[in-house]
Amino acid sequence: MLASSAVFRRQEFLIRCLGVGGQSQQFYRKSIPRTMALEADAENILRAITPTLDLARHKGQAGKIAVIGGCREYTGAPYFSAISALKIGADLSHVFCTKDAAPVIKSYSPELIVHPLLEESYSVREEDKKAISEKVLTEVVKWMERFDCLVVGPGLGRDPFLLGCVSEIMKHARQSNVPIVIDGDGLFLVTNSLDLVSGYPLAVLTPNVNEYKRLVQKVLNCEVGDQDAAEQLLSLAKGIGGVTILRKGKSDLISDGETVNSVGIYGSPRRCGGQGDILSGSVAVFLSWARQRIIAEGDLNISPKSPTVLGSIAGSALMRKAASLAFENKKRSTLTGDIIECLGRSLEDICPAK
């Protein structure tokens, strides 16, 4: 009995060594080097790309941002994005929205330049759609060369005619090398028309959990894996031709298909709607500033080098700082407007104006 027990134990040992039952397979998987997310030096990056306040500068040099979004149902999102850009330090902020949304958005703030140019299907006859689509594009293109960055998607909605018009606007922005930050329903549009951004290095996608899931399913044909989150994000960014993706989460993960950076600055446990809109405006401003600095000075002696990645890191960091500060004051009653009001102080704490 003892001998047979010893033999049995030895057989068990050999089975474990050979990997039956999956133990050696698990060891093998663990031994494979995985892509690791590098914690970004976010505050130093933010300082490096934020322009100084100089009396010699004129209106517009600190950034001109345009938000493409806003329809009958959704007027808050484009306002949050556009006003956040101004609160951070952009000089001018435009909103291109539908005619129904324009009076509402204008009433929120006189600081925004609101263009009631977009149309939805219900207000356009079938025989007029082509002519109106061309007219919308012509009117928006008149402004395009003035902008340092577009934000596409906040409050856009999913009306087919409206999305078709926005697709043409995005194509023209790409031809003009205007950076594009894509959020909200802009991500719905892009997920179904990847060619709009595929291979465009000045595009930034800012998906939340569900938007990211749809992108992964569409591009990688698999489910989201949290254990290999950095590796999967890297593959996704590569799969869309090197666009920059800011995956929102407990820590924001950012990749352009070359590296993966994380921003783990503590934000807020309060998940009120509209925070993604603040982030899109924030990323747009910092992307514009990073690009301006790189064009003017060349190597900024910071890493990473890509303006889209730098802008995403800085935008994420500031948004998180502001959310944390707002939560300290308002706790459970924290709203998006409270976070917006903390953007200026949060930036001042990191990068004091001189």
UniProtKB/Swiss-Prot annotation:
Top-rank taxon: Eukaryota
Organism, scientific name: Vitis vinifera (Grape)
GO biological process: metabolite repair; nicotinamide nucleotide metabolic process
Name of the protein in its database record: ATP-dependent (S)-NAD(P)H-hydrate dehydratase
Protein family: Belongs to the NnrD/CARKD family.
Cofactor: Mg(2+)
Coiled coil ranges: none
CDD domains in UniProt: YXKO-related
Reactions accelerated catalytically: (6S)-NADHX + ATP = ADP + phosphate + NADH + H(+); (6S)-NADPHX + ATP = ADP + phosphate + NADPH + H(+)
Binding annotation for ATP: 248-252, 267-276
Protein's UniProt keywords contain Lipoprotein: no
PROSITE patterns listed in its UniProt record: YJEF_C_3
GO molecular-function terms, A-Z: ATP binding; ATP-dependent NAD(P)H-hydrate dehydratase activity
Residues holding (6S)-NADPHX: G155, N208, V209, N210, E211, Y212, K213, R214, D277
Stated role: Catalyzes the dehydration of the S-form of NAD(P)HX at the expense of ATP, which is converted to ADP. Together with NAD(P)HX epimerase, which catalyzes the epimerization of the S- and R-forms, the enzyme allows the repair of both epimers of NAD(P)HX, a damaged form of NAD(P)H that is a result of enzymatic or heat-dependent hydration.
Location of the YjeF C-terminal domain: 42-350
UniProt KW keywords: ATP-binding, Lyase, NAD, NADP, Nucleotide-binding, Phosphoprotein
Pfam family, any one: Carb_kinase
EC number per UniProt: 4.2.1.93
Gene3D superfamilies in the cross-refs: 3.40.1190.20
